[in-house]
Amino acid sequence: MSNPTHKLITVGGITTDRNTVLKFREPTGTPRDALFRDVANGSYRKPFLVEDLEYRTMCFALDGCTQSEMRLDDPAALTCEYTRKMMGFLVFTARPKQVLMIGLGGGSLAKYCHRHLLTTRVTAVEIDAEVIALRTHFHVPPDDARLRVVNEDGAHYVAQMAGKGQRTDVILVDAYDRFGIAKAVLERAFMENAKQALGAHGVFVINLVAEVDECERHIEMIRSVFGDPVIVIAMKRDGNRVIFAGNPLRNPRHFMLTRRNAERAGGKLGLFFPTLLRHLGTRHERLGLRSP
C-alpha cells in the first residue's frame, strides 16, 4: 500500500500542547496551511495521526474520538480497555487456528495476536485503503503466513465465507469510520452469515459504541441470531460495550475449562477476565444451566 509520492506531513499548533502534532498522509508538497484549515473545519476526509511524546493515535476528526491508539514505547500493547476485553475469546478457545477481524484500524488486536498467538492465522479485513496505508506507522507487521490484511468490505467478506462453507474459530468486529460503526455489521444478515462462518465451536465478539437504547436493540438482535447466553461487558470510562456470543458460551460442561483458559491467559499474557466469567456464571444460572 506504499506510495512513493506520499509521505507523512507534520502540522503543529492545532492543539494547545506544544508536544502534540498532527500527521497527514498526503502527496509531497501539499500545503500545511490547507491541511490545518481542512482538519480544523472538519472537511478533511481521511484518517490522520495525532502524536505526542507517549502515544500515536488514529483519528477521523478533532472531536475527541480516537479510532486507534498505540504506545510509542510498546507498539504491540493493548492500550484501550475494550481491546483487552475483546481478547476474552481466549476464555472459550485458548488456541484458535484462525481469527477473522472485521476492521483493522491501527491494528492493535492484529499486532497483539500476531505476537502472542503463534499458532494462529489472523485475517484482518479493512474497507478503507487509507487506513491500511497507515499500517506501517502503527507497526503492523507485513503480511506473512500468520497475518493477512485484506482491503474489502467486511460484511461482504463474511457473506462470501458463509456461502462457500468456509469456517473460522473467532470473529472480532471493531469496524468504525468517521460516522461511527459500519451499518453493515449491525444488520441481521451479517450476524447470520457470521454465525454460519463460525460453525458449531466459534466465538463472535463485537465492540459497540452507541446510545443505550440502540445498543439494547443490537444486543437483542445478536441474541435472536446466536441464542443465549450473550455476554455484555460495559466499559466504565469510554462507553464501549464488548459483546460475546456463540455456542461455546452455552455449554455448561465447558465452564471449568473456561476458568482454566482464563487462568492461562492471565499467567501467560497478563490478561484477566473476572467480569466475563462472573457474567457467564450468572447467565448460566438464570438460564437454568448448571455451572460447577
Where are each of the predicted segments found?
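C-terminal substrate-binding/active-site "lid" region of AdoMet-derived donor-dependent transferases
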Residues: 3, 188-254
